[in-house]
Amino acid sequence: MAVVRIQSFVLLGLMTLTTLVHAQVPDAGALQQQLQKQVPSNQSLPKPQAPVKKSKPDEAKPGEVKVTIKGFRVDGNKSVPEEAIQQTLKPWLGKTVPFQELQKAADAVAALYQAYGKLAQVSVPPQRITDGVVVLKVLEAKLGAVNIDMPNGPSRFSEERARRYITDANRLSEIIQTQNIERSIYILNETPGVAVTTQLEPGKNEGEVDLRVSLADTKPYRGKVEGNNYGSRSTGVMQRVVNVTFDNPGSYGDQLSFSNIKSLGSDYSQASYSLPIDTDGWRLGVAASYLDYQNVGKFAYPTSSVAGFGYAKTVGLNLSYPVLRSPGANTNFTAGADRKLYANKNAADGTYTSDYRIENMVLGLSGNQFDSWNGGGVNSGSITLTKGHIVVGGGRSDYDSTIPKTFTKYNLSLSRNQQVVPDETILTISASGQFASVDLDSAEKFYLGGPNGVRAYPGSQGAGSQGAMVNIEVQQQLQDKVVATAFFDAGLVQQYKDKALYQANKGSTNANNSYILKGVGAGLKRADKDIIWSASIAWKLGSNPLYTAQGVGVNNDKRSNSAYLWAQVQWTF
């Protein structure tokens, strides 16, 4: 159900309308969803860089002799179609060139091997060219050895374990598959607590190439302390955020994270742990969270007769796998199972307004792609399928009988990060949406408002079972450490899938079943060595679709603000 306006005392007295009570003030499910967005994700996609520095073959020494080329003979080729090689060499046919130009033809064949995922040295051997046919010699590279260096001293991640990340997917003495080598290096470099650089070198035997890996530890821990005003007004706007991550504490690529977000009336904690289960990138993780909240200020009892308190508990398992790793693109697969318990109580007498749990199965794909179009940019996207089941507890067995107990929902996101002026101006366009099979509980709904959504409205504003949102932002570098932003946000939400349910609850919001929130704004961000400051202000566009019986637009924080200011200061360590 969407966020409602504060109505008259008559509406406040309608305690039998459970959905209305939940709509007036964000409950445990709505609060938890907003807080989760502020916790850093440890499953984000990497920004890959060229993983292997390839040695350039020695060029033939220039001479005075020129050669008229009538054809090429390529010796030693086993892995690339001959037709593809001859097509690559076609630009040199019929030309009279100096001898050093022949090495450029050889380099073109080596590049063709790279395109086929192979590594080869292509040279122009000493020869007497009498009939215009040039001989090129191909030496297809085999992996001779994987040598591990530790320039900074012994690593917490063992030498043998690091070597296995390479050799499990790239057998020694076999022809090198460059995509396999690159993938192995990316996965090793993404392992928490591990940093590697690599170099291909000539091997001991002809045709062999050795991979030298420099292995070093990253910091054993990292984190941040943050202050912001991102909280819900019903539980306290000002928040203190602490996040600490321990990389590789067990010396086998594991990761342990703790987060806490505290305001005047809420305390949210989350812990997660993950570890690799093979050398191909599979990771298994567990996570748990706990939220305790009570309404404060004008939302507290006895000022508000619908004031409440409650909690949310979650525990879950997750599995992730890097489907694709390459210099230009990445794809991740995730799967998970969650159990979430919610309880909301009335502050006046302590009776339950809701008591239930949600059991979810989740599958997801996410990816990004790097390109050089118009100065370069990044495309990112994700899709998530959630199948869930609601089990009502004993505290309030009649909780919201209008909400179906099984559901399916899809969440999608797309974004483009485009350099308009390199290193100065960046344009970001992002879109997200949710599609549901039935009406959803507050913990599973789509929300438009808040600092991560339509910034002209408060968090948890614009709730619905289905919705979509677009955010457009321009970032302009003003000086070394300061960035200015200008943005436009817009979102569409459908409160109810069931039209009969909408008609029954229409009076709680006076809004159409589907409505739009939109706004514009500007901001500043300064990044010093360890401290990041940011502030933005957003103004709503158009009238507020949620309004009182008197026609006054009002948000779920009991305000009629035409603008919202968001501020954040963050210290990283």
Which residues fall in each region the model found?
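Transmembrane beta-strands of outer-membrane beta-barrel proteins
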Residues: 223-225, 254-258, 282-286, 331-335, ...
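Periplasmic polypeptide-binding modules associated with outer-membrane biogenesis and secretion
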Residues: 24-231, 259-268, 430-433
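Outer-membrane beta-barrel proteins
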Residues: 246-250, 272-279, 292, 318-326, ...
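C-terminal outer-membrane beta-barrel translocator/porin domains of Gram-negative envelope proteins
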Residues: 345-509
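Outer-membrane beta-barrel "beta-signal"
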Residues: 244, 524-532, 557-573
